[in-house]
């Protein structure tokens, strides 16, 4: 390894005129070395660098294009979703309105049905009351009639004796005999 180091040191001491060698003076050779390195890099790296930049540019353009396509797709989906939302909102409003009107209609039908049922119950109640009143009146009449009949029979039985009975029978026989003579 010492030989390698010595060879580099001896290269630095060669005379610069008429031969190739390394100048180790940093201040004197830095710009030249840099320009040589840059020239070599530009000459050989130009194609590689332009290929890298072109590839990077293509990837960026493809990414932008894909992003634009995705954005357009997202905008289309958003518009479709908004249209569906508007349609669903309209249908919901219609269902709400129809539901409210249906509820009102059912409410009115229920109220009408309840009034009719109450009216029928009132009629049944009145008919039942009238029937019970007639039944009570008939029972009272029957009792009055039975009591009057029993009173009349009691009066007749107490007033009728056999002599009155015989006179009534002979008067009736006389009336029947007179009727027979008139008809003959």
UniProtKB/Swiss-Prot annotation:
Membrane-spanning segments: 27-49
CDD domains: ATP-synt_Fo_b
GO cellular component term of the entry, any: chloroplast thylakoid membrane
Single annotated GO MF: proton-transporting ATP synthase activity, rotational mechanism
InterPro entries in the record: ATP_synth_b/b'su_bac/chlpt (IPR002146)
Keywords recorded for this protein, A-Z: ATP synthesis, CF(0), Chloroplast, Hydrogen ion transport, Ion transport, Membrane, Plastid, Thylakoid, Transmembrane, Transmembrane helix, Transport
Pfam family for this entry, one: ATP-synt_B
Membrane topology: Single-pass membrane protein
Chief location: plastid
Localization: Plastid, Chloroplast thylakoid membrane
Domain of life per record: Eukaryota
Family affiliation: Belongs to the ATPase B chain family.
Misc. comment: In plastids the F-type ATPase is also known as CF(1)CF(0).
Function per UniProt: F(1)F(0) ATP synthase produces ATP from ADP in the presence of a proton or sodium gradient. F-type ATPases consist of two structural domains, F(1) containing the extramembraneous catalytic core and F(0) containing the membrane proton channel, linked together by a central stalk and a peripheral stalk. During catalysis, ATP synthesis in the catalytic domain of F(1) is coupled via a rotary mechanism of the central stalk subunits to proton translocation.
Subunit-level organization: F-type ATPases have 2 components, F(1) - the catalytic core - and F(0) - the membrane proton channel. F(1) has five subunits: alpha(3), beta(3), gamma(1), delta(1), epsilon(1). F(0) has four main subunits: a(1), b(1), b'(1) and c(10-14). The alpha and beta chains form an alternating ring which encloses part of the gamma chain. F(1) is attached to F(0) by a central stalk formed by the gamma and epsilon chains, while a peripheral stalk is formed by the delta, b and b' chains.
Protein name: ATP synthase subunit b, chloroplastic
